[in-house]
Amino acid sequence: MNSNQGTVGSDPVILATAGYDHTVRFWQAHSGICTRTVQHQDSQVNSLEVTPDRSMIAAAGYQHIRMYDLNSNNPNPVINYDGVSKNITSVGFHEDGRWMYTGGEDCMARIWDLRSRNLQCQRIFQVNAPINCVFLHPNQAELIVGDQSGAIHIWDLKTDQNEQLIPETDVSINSVHIDPDASYMAAVNSSGNCFVWNLTGGLGEDLTQLIPKTKIPAHKRCALKCKFSPDSTLLATCSADQTCKIWRTSNFSLMTELSIKSNNPGETSRGWMWDCAFSGDSQYIVTASSDNLARLWCVETGEIKREYSGHQKAVVCLAFNDSVLG
């Protein structure tokens, strides 16, 4: 009998959500049943990421990153990285799991060696404003950092060189993402704009070059997240306007608008759409929003397939991994 049976890590689909109620919840994606709840003491959770080997999940919060075991029902974090001031807003992993990267409101992006017994960070990249988002280029050699001054930094990990661009002065960059083919980079900001660049270079010693492709006036309110689909054909943007919009990357036209706006005239806003993640086949998308719910949608029709209900406060981040390791 498999000792992992019944644990989150043994499920081919990992769906986790977290936010302001100090819990991380794990769900059966197809049924909407919550299978496990972990108490994340004394802190909201700003970002979640599953390790490449699907053995652990990282939860970034106030002054720490905590790693929870997916292959047991241990309620306590198995590793705790701390010693950072302020909120950690972003967390992710190198594709072979050797190191973790984070960004935070202390204006620093950090690299943490996961193989080291010493739980200190190995490298720091300092910028001049609080960091909202960090994303690792698919080449695994450049970190893209977005900050509250409106700057996007490209930190070359091989040479320690960096470049920056400012698509809109003094407008906070809230999310950056590169599609799996490394053809496009997208960034969204607090004015609701989505900027898209074509990517060239980024191989060998070449730093990635960004060629402006388009600017989409995606939302009339603050845009919070952008994500490309695994097949690179779609781009999703989430916003404070209660919508997640799906754009075709062939021409960046709007394909579907997923809305949590109420049809009742008397009902006020259900809150912000904070985060999203596509399924591996790019047919479905999960969203997290401040009405305490996560939802599974059909990308093509915009139909809600499942609601994940249980959080007591806003759901601001999620991790969705339905790729089965070979």
Swiss-Prot record:
Cellular compartments annotated: Lysosome membrane; Cytoplasm
BP GO annotations: TORC2 signaling
Keywords: Cytoplasm, Lysosome, Membrane, Repeat, WD repeat
One GO term describing the cellular component: TORC2 complex
SUPFAM superfamilies from the UniProt entry: Quinoprotein alcohol dehydrogenase-like
Highest taxon in the source lineage: Eukaryota
Pfam families reported for this sequence: WD40
InterPro entries: MLST8, Quinoprotein_ADH-like_sf, WD40/YVTN_repeat-like_dom_sf, WD40_repeat_CS, WD40_rpt
WD repeats by residue range: 1-37, 40-80, 83-122, 126-165, 168-207, 218-257, 268-309
Function, in words: Subunit of both mTORC1 and mTORC2, which regulates cell growth and survival in response to nutrient and hormonal signals. mTORC1 is activated in response to growth factors or amino acids. In response to nutrients, mTORC1 is recruited to the lysosome membrane and promotes protein, lipid and nucleotide synthesis by phosphorylating several substrates, such as ribosomal protein S6 kinase (RPS6KB1 and RPS6KB2) and EIF4EBP1 (4E-BP1).
Subunit structure: Part of the mechanistic target of rapamycin complex 1 (mTORC1) which contains MTOR, MLST8 and RPTOR. Component of the mechanistic target of rapamycin complex 2 (mTORC2), consisting in two heterotretramers composed of MTOR, MLST8, RICTOR and MAPKAP1/SIN1.
PANTHER family: G BETA-LIKE PROTEIN GBL (PTHR19842), TARGET OF RAPAMYCIN COMPLEX SUBUNIT LST8 (PTHR19842:SF0)
Family according to the record: Belongs to the WD repeat LST8 family.
The protein, known as: Target of rapamycin complex subunit lst8
